[in-house]
Amino acid sequence: MKQKYIILVFIGLVCVFNFCSIKPKITPPEKPAAPTTARYRLVWNDDPTTTITVVWDQLRGDNPVVHYGRKDYNKKWEKYPNSQKPTRTTPGYRGMNTHFTKLTDLKPDQVYYFIIKDSEGIGERFWFRTASARPQPFTFIAGGDTKSSGTALEAGRASNKMVAKLRPLFVIFNGDFTSGDGTNAERWQLWLDDWMQMTTTNDGRMIPIVPVHGNHENGDKTVLHNLFDVPYQNNVEENIYYSLTFGGNLFHVIALNSEVEEGGDQRAWLENDLKRHQDFTFKVACYHKPFRPHTVRKSENIYQYEQWAPLFLKYRLSIGLGADSHMSSITYPIRPSEEEGSFEGFIRDDETGTIYVGEGSWGAAPRDNNDDKPWTLRSGSFNQIKWFHVFPTTDDKPAHIEIHTIITATFDEDENITTYGDDVVPLTEKNLFEIPNNLNFFSPEPHGAVVTFPFKEKK
C-alpha cells in the first residue's frame, strides 16, 4: 500500500512538473496589411459643382471600387450608397498603376466621404467638398515650381503643409512639378506621395488640384493628362488647356498652356471661352510663363503677350496668374499699350486693367527680384504661395478678391533655409476666412498683407 502511495505521489509530481514546464503558445499580433493603394489626389477637370475625379496608384489587388456618399461610414464600405469603378487606367506610366474614377451627379456645396475597396483590402477614408453652384465666398491657393531634392524639396514641403492648414476649396498648381523634363518616374512618385501626405487635412479632407502644364513637363507634353486626367483640346493630347466655373457666374478660371502654340487653335479657343464667360464677375487665367518676368534671369515672352494680352483686355480679365520665375510679384492693374507712359507693352489702368500675380517658387530656389517695372506693385525673393479670398456682392460690399502672399521659406546669404508654418494653427470648416496666428505674410506698405481686386489705392 505504501509503495502504491509513493508511486502515485511520484506520478503526480511528474505531471505537475510537466504542466508547469509547458509554455503556453502565444500568437504574435498580426501585422497590419500593407496598403494596396497610394498617391491619392483629387482633380477638378469638369464641373466642380457636380463632378470630381479620384486618382490613385493601385499597388496590388484587383477590382478596385470607390465607395462614397454624404454620410461618414468610415471604412464600412458596404454602407455607402454610391460606388464607381475606375473609368480609366494608365498601367505602367511613370512606374505606377494609375486609376481614375470620375464621380458624377454630385450635389453642389456638399461634403462627400469615400474609400477605395479592392480584392485585398480597404483604403483609408477621406472626404472632399464640392463647389457651390451659387455665388458664395470661397478661398483658393495658387503657385507653382517645385523640385525633387535638397533644400528646394524641403521648401516645397513647407508650402504643401500650408495647404492642409488653410483648407482652400482648391489649389491651382501652375506648372513645373518636378526637376528635369517630367519623365522621371521616381520624381513623380515622390511628388505625388508628398502631395497626398502633406496637403490632406488632419481630419482627412483632400483638396482638389487644378493642374497647369509647365516647361519642366515638356519631356512628355501628355503627362498631366496621364497623371491627372486633365482635358485636352482638338483631339490632340498635348493641347492641355481647359476652364472651370465656380459659384454660378461668380468666378471663371482658365488654365492655359504656355508650352504649346499660344496662337492658332489655343488663341481661338481662349477667345471663345472668354466671350462665353465675359459677363462673369471674375475671370482668372493661369499659365506657367509670365509675359514680363520680374527677374533678369528669365526672358520676355513677347509672342505669348501678343496672342493673349489683347484678349485679356477685350474681355476684362481680372487676374493673370504666372509662375516660372521662382520669385514673388504683384502688379498694379495694367493693360496692353504702346502709348506714352507705357513700359514693355503695358500701362497702369486701375479701371480696365488686369492684376498680374506670380511668379512661382512654391519650392524652387528663389531668384532675385531684380527686374521691377513702373507698374510693379511689389516683388520679393522667397518661397511663397498666393492665398485668395473670393467674395460675391453683398448688401454692404461689392464683389472683390483679396490676395495674400504667404512666405513659406527663405534663404540667407549662405543658402541656409528657414521654413515657416509649423506654428500656424490649422483652420477648421467653421473659420475658413480667418487669418491664423503666426502666418508669415509678405506685407510691404502701403498695402500691407492684402491686395484687393478691384484695386484700391492706399496712401
Regions found by a protein language model. Name each.
Residues M1-Y5:
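Positively charged n-region of N-terminal signal peptides that target proteins for export
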Residues V9-V16:
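Bacterial N-terminal signal peptides
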Residues V16-A142, D395-K459:
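Acidic, histidine-bearing metal-coordination/catalytic regions of metal-dependent phosphoesterases
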Residues D72-T98, T139-R157, D181, H225-N234, ...:
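Acidic/histidine-rich helix-loop elements
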Residues F100-K102, V111-W127, A185-D279, Q307, ...:
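Extended active-site neighborhood of metal-dependent phosphoesterases/phosphodiesterases
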Residues G121-G180:
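An acidic-aromatic substrate-binding cleft motif
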Residues D145, G175-D176, G214-N215, L256, ...:
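Active-site glycine-centered loops adjacent to acidic/histidine catalytic or metal-binding residues
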Residues K161-F170, T199-P208, H252, S258-T352, ...:
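His/acidic metal-ligating clusters that form di-metal
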